[in-house]
Regions:
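Short acidic, hydrophobic short linear motifs in intrinsically disordered regions
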Residues: 71-82
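Long, Pro/Ser/Thr-rich low-complexity/intrinsically disordered regulatory tracts in eukaryotic proteins
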Residues: 140, 146-238
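Single conserved hydrophobic/aromatic residue that forms the stacking wall/gate
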Residues: 252-263
């Protein structure tokens, strides 16, 4: 890595701009950095939570997101009620927020109504922003934002994480045949559980990790497209919000053990 990358690229790329209070508030609400959550440290414009959101979020978007709460799904009528905004205008704003990666959406409720969710940074908005070529080209700092938010929340805490991760970070689902003979493997740890649950709705999407690293010269020779598989409502999300997703079909290549191939 070049010296200027080490010293400059993980800082606010636009220090000359005035500090935006709604973005600071939103960054503080979404972050999972313990020191900031506990009030031991103050979030500033030099922190990635601020400059990452500032790149993809207007003040108006931030005000709406602040009313959503983190990982608290809300339908459009519910958001109209708590924001007082016109329904059509609000829906257009939410669509823009989803396009930028600030929020996601799904239909996982008894009435199967579309609901909007303000996610964490990782996994969440920092990844989504890196999946969209248009966003990443306009705001290459999003690559560094993803790296920072996948690393700094756990600094000083990783030694306390027990084997298995305790639900922290991302969970790897191994190849099915590697766990079929394991008596301790529960259904959630088998890829067949997830593929059967969301049968018929899959999408291939780019690897946000690979795409983000290329923005600060740590990329590899891999083509980042098509590495990740989104299932269920997330498949619709990565396609509809132009996260370079495309619907695919998954075929059983053998009846037992179950191996899967994407096409």
């Amino acid at each position: 890595m070049a010296e200027n990358t080490k010293n400059v690229e993980f800082k606010n790329p636009h220090p000359e701009l005035p500090v935006r209070e709604p973005i600071l508030k939103l960054g503080k609400m979404v972050t999972d950095r313990a020191a900031i959550k506990l009030g031991l440290e103050k979030l500033t414009a030099d922190d990635p939570e601020y400059w990452g959101l500032a790149a993809i979020c207007t003040d108006e978007m931030a005000e709406v997101a602040l009313k959503m709460g983190v990982r608290k799904p809300k339908t459009l009528p519910e958001l109209v009620k708590i924001t007082g905004m016109d329904e059509k205008y609000l829906e257009e704003l939410l669509n823009k927020m989803a396009f930028n990666g600030v929020i996601e959406y799904n239909w996982e409720n008894p009435k199967h109504e579309k609901q909007y969710v303000l996610p964490m940074f990782v996994p969440g908005s920092a990844e989504f922003a890196n999946m969209n070529d248009a966003v990443l080209e306009e705001h290459p700092e999003m690559g560094r934002f993803f790296e920072r938010m996948s690393r700094i929340p756990l600094e000083g805490l990783t030694h306390m994480v027990p084997p298995g991760g305790a639900g922290i970070g991302m969970h790897v689902i191994p190849v099915q045949k590697e766990v079929d003979m394991c008596n301790e493997a529960i259904s959630l740890e088998k890829i067949s559980y997830w593929l059967d649950k969301y049968e018929g709705k899959y999408a291939a999407s780019p690897c946000s990790c690979r795409k983000s690293r290329k923005t600060y010269d740590e990329g590899c020779a891999d083509d980042p497209e098509g590495w990740c598989i989104a299932i269920g409502d997330m498949a619709d999300y990565v396609v509809e919000t132009q996260k370079d997703g495309r619907y695919i079909c998954l075929l059983y290549t053998s009846p037992s053990p179950r191996d899967y191939a994407a096409s």
